[in-house]
Design a protein with these regions (language model features):
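Non-catalytic cap/lid and distal C-terminal segments of serine-dependent acyl enzymes
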Residues: 1-115
Length: 115
């Protein structure tokens, strides 16, 4: 199982991701593609369940985080994704503190530790 809070879902397609990938990998776009979750879903052979929580009041949502692109890739590839848009939440500690227990339970269920 995989989970994330407000991840940069398509780093090849946002300023933060492009800046980070340039710093890590230079201008070798093939290396960028090997680390972009939205692109990797197209070639994934495992279908691990994914949980993403995203606040709908997050100021980075549209330009930087772009979860809709990841959601589209998962739908296109029949990859299990639960994308939860949380009303009124931003990119803060309170957002994570509110939903961290859900993420822990998500992984515990995937591991068969709880029902």
């Amino acid at each position: 199982s995989v989970s994330a809070f407000a991840p940069i879902c398509a780093p090849n397609q946002c300023p933060w991701g492009q800046k980070a990938f340039s710093g890590y990998f230079g201008q070798n776009k093939a290396l960028w593609h090997q680390h972009d979750a939205t692109l990797l879903v197209d070639s994934a052979t495992e279908r691990l369940p994914i949980l993403i929580d995203q606040g709908d009041a997050d100021g980075f949502l549209v330009e930087q985080l772009r979860p809709a692109l990841f959601e589209e890739a998962c739908q296109r590839n029949d990859h299990p994704l639960e994308l939860r848009m949380q009303t009124g939440y931003d990119h803060s500690y309170f957002f994570i503190a509110t939903f961290i227990e859900d993420h822990l339970n998500f992984h515990a269920k995937a591991l068969g530790l709880i029902d």
